[in-house]
Amino acid sequence: MKDNYLIAVTGGIGSGKSMVLSIIKDLGYPTLSCDQVTNEVYKKHKVKSRLAKMFPNAKTGRLFIKIDKKIIAKEVFSSKQKLKQLTDFLTPIILEQTLKKARKIQGKVFVEVPLLFECKAQDKFDKIIVVKRNLNSRIESVMARSNLIKEQVLERINSQFDYDGADLSCYSVLLNDGDIKSLEEKVKNLI
C-alpha cells in the first residue's frame, strides 16, 4: 500500500502555479517544486559539464564551471531544437529527483511540475491540478517578475504545452482569474 498521494500542480508560465503551491504550503501540506530541484541539479558537475558542451556561450569559469541560466534561456526560447535538446536532457533528471524526494513524504504531497505534459509524466501522479489564467494576466505577471518584454514572454508561452487547446476534462482545473483571496478560496475548495 502506498504511503503517499502525489498531486501535481502544473500550468503555463505566469499562470500562478507557484502562488497556488505557496497557498497549499500555508495550509500545512508538504510541497515540492521542480524549480527548486532544478537549482540543485544545475550544481552537479556532470550536469554542468554537459550543459557547457550543449551551450558553450553559457559557460563561465575555467577551473570551476558555472552555467549562466539566462544565456541558456535566451537560446532555448528562440530555438525549438535547443529547447528540445535541453528538455530531453534535464527533465528526466529533474523529475526523477523530485519524485524521489516526494515519495519519502507521507500523506498528500503537492508537487509543482511546470513541464508535466511536455514530459508526459501524468501517470506518475495520483491527481493533477492545472492552473489556468488569461493570457494578458500571464504576460503582465511574467514581465513584472522577469524583466522580459512582451515578445519574449509570448515566445516562452508559445514554446509550452497548449493548455487552452487541450482537453483537460480529466484533471482538476483551477482558474486563477481574481485576487489572492479568491485564489485562496478556490485552492481550499479544491484540496
Locations of the language-model features?
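Hydrophobic anchor at the beta1->P-loop junction of P-loop NTPases
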Residues: I7-V9
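Walker A/P-loop
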Residues: S18
